[in-house]
Amino acid sequence: MTENQQLKALLSACHWIGEKGWCPATGGNMSLRLDDQHCLVTESGKDKGSLTETDFLLVETASNHVPSGRTPSAETGLHTLIYRLYPQIGAVLHTHSVNATVLSRVERSDGLVLQGYEMQKSLGGQTTHLDSVVIPIFDNDQDISRLAARVAAHAEATPLQYGFLVRGHGLYCWGRQVAEARRHLEGLEFLFQCELQRRLLEAK
């Protein structure tokens, strides 16, 4: 797909995310890799359900510099980190859904284990419900550079797959193209809802 087609696909995904209620009150941020040096990131404070092409800002991946001087998402550094770590990644989606936010708080360990669900196969490379998928959880931090450093240290020891959670904050997930990132988001959100319901029922 061309750059313009990918951007249109990302806009469509953003509007769909808005309809799902996964980025309330202008929360969340989305991005698209352009090349090895640049990406597009959503401007700060924009409602994700009504984004237009002008709401994406050009960002230099190595430095987070924005040539236009406008203000990108405060969490731009996490998007650019993912692009630097994994050259194959083409799009990153960050959402604030209720299920992701709550699960990231009730799970006390540093990873959410998903196992036994057929929908694990919505995640690239997963072929069976018998495997375990671990979604790392990082404690929230308003200092994004410090949070990015912790994510980078984890990724150096254990490569990230599909996404990670920030505790009490939300989900970051990605894909090689927008379509794959969107599928991973939808699959993970389904799995989060299943896992949350399972825990609630088992607690009764």
Swiss-Prot record:
Cofactor binding comment, as recorded: Binds 1 zinc ion per subunit.
Record field: catalytic activity: 5-(methylsulfanyl)-D-ribulose 1-phosphate = 5-methylsulfanyl-2,3-dioxopentyl phosphate + H2O
InterPro entries reported in the protein's UniProt record: Aldolase_II/adducin_N, Aldolase_II/adducin_N_sf, MethylthioRu-1-P_deHdtase_MtnB
Top-level taxon of origin: Bacteria
A GO MF label: methylthioribulose 1-phosphate dehydratase activity
Keyword terms of this UniProt record: Amino-acid biosynthesis, Lyase, Metal-binding, Methionine biosynthesis, Zinc
Broad class of enzyme this protein falls into: lyase
Pathway(s) of this molecule: Amino-acid biosynthesis; L-methionine biosynthesis via salvage pathway; L-methionine from S-methyl-5-thio-alpha-D-ribose 1-phosphate: step 2/6
One GO CC annotation: cytoplasm
Signal peptide stretch: none
Gene Ontology terms: biological process: L-methionine salvage from methylthioadenosine; monosaccharide metabolic process
UniProt keyword Amino-acid biosynthesis present: yes
Pfam families linked: Aldolase_II
Annotated EC: 4.2.1.109
Record-listed Zn(2+) binding positions: H94, H96
Family recorded in the similarity comment: Belongs to the aldolase class II family. MtnB subfamily.
Biological role: Catalyzes the dehydration of methylthioribulose-1-phosphate (MTRu-1-P) into 2,3-diketo-5-methylthiopentyl-1-phosphate (DK-MTP-1-P).
Protein name, per record: Methylthioribulose-1-phosphate dehydratase
Naturally occurring in which organism (per UniProt): Serratia proteamaculans (strain 568)
Gene expressing this chain: mtnB
